[in-house]
Swiss-Prot record:
HAMAP family: Pantothen_kinase_3. GO terms for molecular function: ATP binding; pantothenate kinase activity. This is Type III pantothenate kinase. Its EC number is 2.7.1.33.
Length: 262
């Protein structure tokens, strides 16, 4: 039994094929395409893959993109299943005012982070709290307490959106290809460093608040296209986990199988 995990963000679709629908399953193949080229999946990326027997995905790019993806899944006559955030599930208690309105990618990433923390917690020890950071078109910074309760989070513009906003709202500034540095001495570096420091500051503030609330230092788990770049400038220890969303989908898929829903 092979399992297909799909993560549709605002810019790209990422997929992973696993040998089973359970945590710790072996990754057989993976890839990513821009949303504009989804129609090529069945003829290119997926053409030579083994036939998956189940799939689960999360999608934040809207119904139209999800339907386009489902058309590609017809290659295998595969019934699509998409995550909707729940009040409780995957080891996470959803503290959002309206739980179903929490972005499914955020919820799935928290499930993946919680699974990772529980695996690394010794017998009889209490899990540590976590800051779950997704660095993409937007940046999300979510707090999970030691009991697995999501207690709140932040949404910020990502690097690209910050730079575009400055380009549109100011005279004489163009989107740069600058570097992140401590003391920028040119406009390109100043813009890139300003965006990076703004995101890093939000994460560090959330870390401080969660530590004050829980009485123990949280772990920061970070994923997304620019995660490695951002982690390098953080003043706090950061674990970059590229598969955080896929790990969450594996846990949720396993729960579906156990409940007889798959």
């Amino acid at each position: 039994m092979s399992f297909l995990a799909i993560d549709i963000g605002n810019t790209r679709l990422k997929w992973g094929l696993y040998d089973a629908a359970k945590p710790g399953a072996r990754l057989l193949a993976h890839g990513a395409v821009f949303l504009e080229t989804i129609e090529q999946l069945a003829e290119q990326d997926w053409a030579r893959l083994p036939h998956p027997t189940a799939m689960l995905g999360c999608a934040v790019a809207g119904d139209a993109v999800r339907r386009r993806t489902e058309e590609q899944l017809e290659l295998w006559d595969l019934t699509p299943h998409w995550v909707v955030s729940q009040p409780v599930g995957g080891g996470i208690v959803n503290g959002y005012d309206h739980p179903s309105r929490l972005g499914s990618d955020r919820w799935v990433a928290m499930v993946g982070a919680r699974e990772r923390i529980l695996e690394q917690t010794g017998p009889g020890a209490r899990p540590v709290p976590a800051i779950v950071v997704m660095v993409g078109t937007a940046v999300t910074v979510d707090a999970v307490d030691p009991d697995g309760c999501f207690i709140g989070g932040l949404i910020l513009p990502g690097f690209g959106l910050m730079l575009k906003a400055l380009e549109m709202g100011t005279a004489g500034l163009r989107v740069p290809t600058g570097d992140v540095c401590e003391f920028p001495t040119n406009t390109s570096d100043a813009l890139m460093s300003g965006g990076a420091c703004g995101i890093a500051g939000a994460i560090e503030r959330m870390h401080r608040q969660l530590q004050q609330r829980c009485g123990v230092a949280p772990r920061i788990l970070m994923s997304g296209g620019a995660a490695t770049k951002l982690a390098q400038i953080m003043a706090l220890p950061v674990e970059v986990v590229d598969t955080l969303v896929f790990d969450g989908l594996l846990r949720l898929a396993s729960d579906r199988v156990a409940a007889g829903l798959a």
